[in-house]
Design a protein with these regions (language model features):
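A flexible loop/linker signature enriched in serine peptidases of the S9 family
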Residues: 3-22, 36-41, 56-86, 105-111, ...
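Serine-hydrolase catalytic core recognition
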Residues: 261-589
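Beta-propeller and related beta-repeat scaffolds in trafficking/envelope systems
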Residues: 182-201, 206-221, 254, 258-261, ...
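Short loop/turn segments that connect beta-strands within beta-propeller blades
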Residues: 25-29, 90-94, 145-149, 200-204, ...
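Hydrophobic alpha-helical signal peptides and transmembrane signal-/tail-anchor segments
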Residues: 593-604
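Residue-level detector of Asp-centered blade-edge/turn motifs that repeat once per structural unit
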Residues: 48-49, 119-120, 170-171, 223-225, ...
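Hydrophobic beta-strand positions that form the internal "hydrophobic ladder"
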Residues: 2, 50-53, 124, 172-175, ...
C-alpha cells in the first residue's frame, strides 16, 4: 500500500474542509480516504508489516482567553502554542471495505518535521522543527519508546543543524540523515555544505559518512546490504558514489556527465532506479539491474520527448579569477542555438539562489530556472557559481561570510570582465537577474555598476536589517553577516542596496509572492518605491496567495517568465546611460516646475 498527504483535496474530488490521509491499495487497485479530523498532518511512516500507520499532526491551537483577546493575535505566544500530536491508524480490509481504528500515541510540546519507525527497538524517531528559524536548538532528533506509553521523548542529538531525509538502516541499528549546519555554538559543525551522517541507535554515536568527499551530498539511498549509494556534487556535476557503512572511502561509479537527481534501490536485489538529466538529455527516470549499467541505462519514461526534438542551446563550463584574492570562480555558459562559441554576444547573468546551492549540468525548464529559454531567445547566459556555492569545498563556501553581497558580487563582475576581454560578450548588451539569493545579488549589483541595461529581481532583499527582523530565517542572515544587526550595524548598512539606490540607472523588473515569509514582499515594495522616486523604469508584480516558491498556481510561473522576457526585449539593448540622461532631464524639469510654482504663489 501507499499512503500520501495531498496538499489540495480538490485534486482528488474532495471538497471537505477536514483533513484526510489517502491509502492506495495495490491489491484492490483502489484509493481509500481516511478522515482524521481538523489537525493538519505533516508526516507519516508505516509500521513493520504495514498493518498500521503512524502520522504526526500540528495540533489545533486551543482558543485561550478568547473573550479577552477576541481576534487579536499575540505573535510569539501564538507561535509557541503550536504543538504536535502523533497518531496510529490500524487497518483492516474485509471484502474490499477498509475499516480503521485511530489512537493517540503522544501529545508533544514540539513541532515535528519527519517521522520514521524503527522495528528493531519498537521506537519512533522524529526531527523537531520550528516555524521561526531563530535557534538551531529547535532542530534536533528525538525518539519515542512505543513499549512505554508514559515515557517522555528522548533527545538523541545536540547537532544544532537542520536534519532531514531520515532513513533507518535495514538492520534497524542506524539512523541516516542529511544535515545542513549554519555554525554551532559548540563549534562542532562549522561547515555549511550538505553532509550525511549515521547515528548508532544503540550507543548514540554520531558518524559522518563520505567524510573525505570535498563536495556536497545531494541525495542518498540505502542498499540491500550494509552500504549506501550517494549522489555527490563536485563543481557543476552530480555523480553516483557508494560507501559501506563500515568503511570510510567512497567508491565512484562511472556514469554520464550531468546530474543524477534522485536514486532508489530495491531491498531484494541489485535493481536501481534514478532520475537523470543534463543539458544534452532531458529529465527522465531510468531503471538498471546493477550499478555497472549506469552508462548503458535505458529510460522507462518519455515525458519530455517534445524537448528532445528542439534545437537546444549548447553549454560549456567557463572559469575566471577574482582579481582581488585570485580565487578561481566557475560558471556555466549557455550559447544560443547555432551560436556555440560565437563572439560578441548579448549576455544575461542568471544568478542561482541559496546561497548554499549551485548551478548544475541539468536541464530544468521551470519558472525558477529558465536559462535554456533565455538562450533560445538569443542571449548568452552565464550562471556563476559564486562564493557560497556548494560543490567547491567548505572553505570556498564559507568565504561568503562577513561580505555576503560584496564578495560574491565581485566574483560575478570579474566574470563579466573576463567574458568581455575574451571577446565572447558585447559590453554594450548586458543584463542580470536572479531569484531569492539571486535576487539579493541582482539588487546589489545594479548599485555597483551602470553596465547593465536591464535587471530581473525576484524575491530579493534591499535592507538586511528589516529583512532580519521580518523573515522566517533570521539565523541565516546572522550567520552570513557574522553577527546581529545592532552589533555590526555598519556591515548591514554597507551591504544593503537601499542605501545606494542613488547609484542605480538600470531598468528593473521585480516579482514577489504576496505571502512570502522567507523574503517578505515588503522588500520588493521598498525597491520599487526607491527606483520609482528616482525615475528609473521599474515594474513590480505580486503573485496572490504565493509564498517564496510559486507553486499554488501554474499560471503564476508562466506569467513571471513571460513578463521577464518582455522586459529583456524592451530594455536589454538600450544603454543604461540613456535612462540616466532621461532621469536627469526629468529632475531638471521637476525643479523648474517647483521654481515657477514658487514664483507664482509668491507674486500672488
Amino acid at each position: 500500500m501507499i499512503a500520501f498527504l495531498p496538499k489540495n483535496h480538490s485534486l482528488i474530488n474532495k471538497q471537505e474542509t477536514g483533513q484526510y490521509i489517502y491509502i492506495y491499495s495495490f491489491l484492490f487497485d483502489e484509493l481509500f480516504s481516511i478522515e482524521i479530523g481538523n489537525d493538519t498532518p505533516v508526516t507519516l511512516t508505516w509500521s513493520k508489516n504495514d498493518s498500521s500507520l503512524y502520522f504526526a499532526c500540528i495540533k489545533s491551537s486551543p482558543k485561550i482567553d478568547e473573550d479577552e483577546w477576541k481576534d487579536v493575535i499575540q505573535y510569539r505566544e501564538n507561535s509557541l502554542r503550536q504543538k504536535a500530536v502523533i497518531y496510529q491508524i490500524h487497518f483492516n480490509f474485509n471484502d474490499r471495505v477498509l475499516s480503521t481504528e485511530t489512537n493517540i500515541i503522544r501529545n508533544l510540546s514540539l513541532l515535528i518535521g519527519k517521522l520514521v519507525y524503527v522495528s528493531f527497538s519498537e521506537k519512533l524517531i522524529f526531527s523537531s522543527v520550528s516555524q521561526l528559524i531563530e535557534d538551531m536548538n529547535d532542530f534536533e532528533l528525538y525518539s519515542i519508546d512505543l513499549r512505554n506509553s508514559t515515557a517522555e521523548p528522548s533527545r538523541l542529538t545536540y547537532n544544532e543543524g537542520l536534519e532531514f531525509q531520515l532513513q533507518v538502516s535495514n538492520d534497524g541499528q542506524y539512523l541516516l540523515f542529511r544535515m545542513l549546519s549554519l555554525g554551532s555554538n559548540k563549534e562542532l559543525f562549522n561547515h555549511t555544505q550538505y553532509r550525511l551522517y549515521s547515528l548508532n541507535l544503540i550507543d548514540n554515536k554520531l558518524t559522518r559518512l563520505a567524510e573525505h568527499f570535498e563536495g556536497n551530498i545531494n541525495q542518498y539511498a540505502m542498499k540491500s546490504d550494509s552500504s549506501i549509494y550517494i549522489l555527490g556534487q563536485l563543481g557543476t556535476e552530480v555523480h553516483v558514489y557508494s560507501q559501506d557503512l563500515s568503511m570510510k572511502d567512497l567508491v565512484y561509479h562511472n556514469g554520464w556527465n550531468g546530474t543524477y537527481e534522485l536514486i532508489a534501490c530495491s531491498r531484494k536485489n541489485q535493481s536501481i532506479a534514478f532520475v537523470y538529466s543534463s543539458f544534452e538529455r532531458s529529465m527522465e527516470i531510468y531503471l538498471i539491474n546493477d550499478i555497472t549499467e549506469l552508462k548503458s541505462a535505458q529510460s522507462i519514461t518519455d515525458e519530455n520527448q517534445l524537448i528532445t526534438e528542439r534545437n537546444l542551446p549548447k553549454i560549456e563550463v567557463y572559469s575566471w579569477k577574482n582579481d582581488d584574492d585570485h580565487r578561481t570562480i566557475e560558471g556555466i555558459l549557455h550559447y544560443p542555438p547555432e551560436k556555440f562559441q560565437s563572439k560578441n554576444l548579448p549576455l544575461l547573468v542568471f544568478i542561482h539562489g541559496g546561497p548554499y546551492w549551485a548551478s548544475l549540468n541539468s536541464l530544468d525548464l521551470g519558472w525558477y530556472q529558465w536559462t535554456t529559454l533565455a538562450a533560445s531567445q538569443g542571449w548568452l547566459v552565464l550562471e556563476p557559481n559564486y562564493r557560497g556555492s556548494t560543490g567547491y569545498g567548505d572553505q570556498f563556501l564559507n568565504e561568503i561570510r562577513y561580505k555576503p553581497l560584496s564578495r560574491p558580487g565581485k566574483d560575478i563582475l570579474y566574470g563579466i570582465d573576463q567574458l568581455i576581454k575574451d571577446g565572447i560578450v558585447d559590453r554594450n548588451r548586458l543584463a542580470i537577474g536572479g531569484y531569492s539569493y539571486g535576487g539579493f545579488l541582482t539588487n546589489w549589483l545594479i548599485t555597483q555598476t551602470k553596465r547593465f541595461n536591464a535587471a530581473l529581481s525576484g524575491a530579493g532583499v534591499v535592507d538586511f536589517t528589516s529583512a532580519w527582523a521580518t523573515m522566517d530565517l533570521p539565523i541565516l542572515l546572522g550567520y552570513l553577516f557574522g553577527e546581529l544587526p545592532w552589533k555590526i550595524p555598519h556591515t548591514y548598512l554597507n551591504e544593503s542596496p537601499i542605501y545606494q539606490l542613488d547609484r542605480v540607472c538600470t531598468p528593473t523588473h521585480i516579482v514577489t509572492g504576496e505571502k512570502d515569509v522567507r523574503v517578505p514582499a515588503a522588500q520588493s515594495y521598498m525597491l520599487e518605491r526607491g527606483l520609482h522616486f528616482r525615475n528609473i523604469p521599474v515594474k513590480l508584480i505580486t503573485f496572490p496567495k504565493e509564498g517564496h516558491s510559486l507553486r499554488n498556481n501554474p499560471w503564476h510561473g508562466k506569467i513571471k517568465v513571460r513578463e521577464e522576457l518582455k522586459w529583456l526585449q524592451k530594455y536589454g539593448n538600450q544603454s543604461c546611460t540613456q535612462h540616466v540622461e532621461s532621469t536627469r532631464n526629468h529632475s531638471i524639469r521637476q525643479e523648474l516646475t517647483y521654481y515657477f510654482l514658487f514664483l507664482f504663489f509668491f507674486i500672488m
